[in-house]
Amino acid sequence: MARRGLLLVLLALLALPIFSQTKYALVIGLGKQEDRAWPKINGDKDVPRVRQMLRKGGYDKIISLVNERATKRNILSAFNTLVGKARPGDIFYIHYSGHGQQVADPHHDEPDGLDECWIPYDAYKKACARDRGERHLSDDEVNYYLGQLRDKVGDRGKILVVIDACHSGDATCGDEGEEVLRGVSEVFDATCHFAEPIPRAVSRRKERWITISACTSAQSNAELRNPVAGRLTYALWQILSDQSSMSNAELERRIRRFYQGIRSRVYQTPVITGEYKNLQRISDFLR
């Protein structure tokens, strides 16, 4: 009997690595750019709040890329690191606070002829000798790495992407003083393919994760003035820091209420998308 009990304990211990879930995070925040033509924003100020929220939610494997460290090379390296570490059932939180920009699609695989891009530290606002498009981080590239993560973690794994940016807008807006917007309306005219072309069959995969965006594609994303922060980032920090469990519909309602309480001329609506949005609770990523 004792021998059988010992055997059961050993089997349970052996099974632990199979069913354990490790939490990983990549947090990118930009308030500075190599190209000074970009409007000044404060995405770097979001990082401490995001890290605090993640630590409270049990994340101890966090990669933070802020300002000068958030080059395209470093961001791709971080994605490769996460893919290399991913195991079935693992949990991944990806956060981007910074500018967004649309780029004339060099691969001709977008219906509207435009790629939506995150703006790393070394990306330029206009095409030039230093950046012909290869320093922008396209949605195809981001989706490629997220797809690789999903392949590794399987259906039991969790992937959440938070985008506190937008791909349109101007530097300032409104009659009640300046409002800082993340994103520019000017389309970048890429003169070359991106550094790492992504096969169309891979880049066009379905959104096999959950994405929370600060606004719709037709809206601008304005920062908070006091405290200085991204609207979506601060809303999530306030709503999810107490680790309450709630449906994604309830979370979206609370973010909308938070937005409505802001005195601003910029109207924006949070958006939750992805195949897993009705299968996994966002609040559970931080519990």
Where are the language model's segments positioned?
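N-terminal secretory signal peptides that target proteins for export/translocation
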Residues: 1-2
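Short glycine-rich His-centered loop
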Residues: 22-38
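Bacterial N-terminal signal peptides
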Residues: 5-17
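Caspase-like (clan CD) cysteine peptidase catalytic core
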Residues: 20-22, 74-97, 102-176, 246-254
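Solvent-exposed loop/turn segments at secondary-structure junctions
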Residues: 31-35, 60, 68-72, 98-103, ...
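Active-site-proximal C-terminal subdomain of hydrolase catalytic domains
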Residues: 29, 47, 51, 139, ...
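Second-shell loop/turn segments in exported
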Residues: 34-41, 63-69, 128-135, 220-226, ...
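Functional beta-strand-loop-alpha-helix junction segments that form "active/interaction loops"
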Residues: 44-90, 130-144, 258, 269-271, ...
